[in-house]
Amino acid sequence: MRVPAQLLGLLLLWLPGARCAIRMTQSPSSFSASTGDRVTITCRASQGISSYLAWYQQKPGKAPKLLIYAASTLQSGVPSRFSGSGSGTDFTLTISCLQSEDFATYYCQQYYSYP
């Protein structure tokens, strides 16, 4: 049986699990801070990702280090001054009292869907 192309297109739109690429936006893109400061970094997803979000810390010349997964679960060995919150589209990484060893680049990553 032949299915008209228009109908096939509509059916594809309704396929469960069919998703567009998810765009992640972090803010601020850069900032200055001093030891002892409370630092907050936000991450926004272009569509809902439930709690499928991880935060990483990367220092120059080193591989990224996982800090937080499932939006708020601290990876073993990560100091408790790091915390994560949020669900859906809006997420936050907070460092409650910045230490000298925390000066680094921080990234969020969604793992709700893959390209």
UniProtKB/Swiss-Prot annotation:
Known partners and oligomeric status: Immunoglobulins are composed of two identical heavy chains and two identical light chains; disulfide-linked.
Region (Framework-2): 55-69
Stretches for region Complementarity-determining-3: 109-115
Region of interest called Framework-1, as start-end residue ranges on this chain: 21-43
Location of the region described as Complementarity-determining-2 in the Swiss-Prot/TrEMBL record: 70-76
Keywords: Adaptive immunity, Cell membrane, Disulfide bond, Immunity, Immunoglobulin, Immunoglobulin domain, Membrane, Secreted, Signal
Domain Ig-like: 21-115
Gene Ontology process terms (BP): adaptive immune response; immune response
Record's keyword annotation contains Transferase: no
Major location category of this protein: secreted
Positions of region (Complementarity-determining-1): 44-54
Region (Framework-3): 77-108
Designated name of the protein: Immunoglobulin kappa variable 1-8
GO CC entries: extracellular region; immunoglobulin complex; plasma membrane
Disulfide bond positions: 43-108
Function: V region of the variable domain of immunoglobulin light chains that participates in the antigen recognition. Immunoglobulins, also known as antibodies, are membrane-bound or secreted glycoproteins produced by B lymphocytes. In the recognition phase of humoral immunity, the membrane-bound immunoglobulins serve as receptors which, upon binding of a specific antigen, trigger the clonal expansion and differentiation of B lymphocytes into immunoglobulins-secreting plasma cells.
Signal sequence, renumbered to the chain: 1-20
Localization terms from the record: Secreted; Cell membrane
Listed Pfam families: V-set
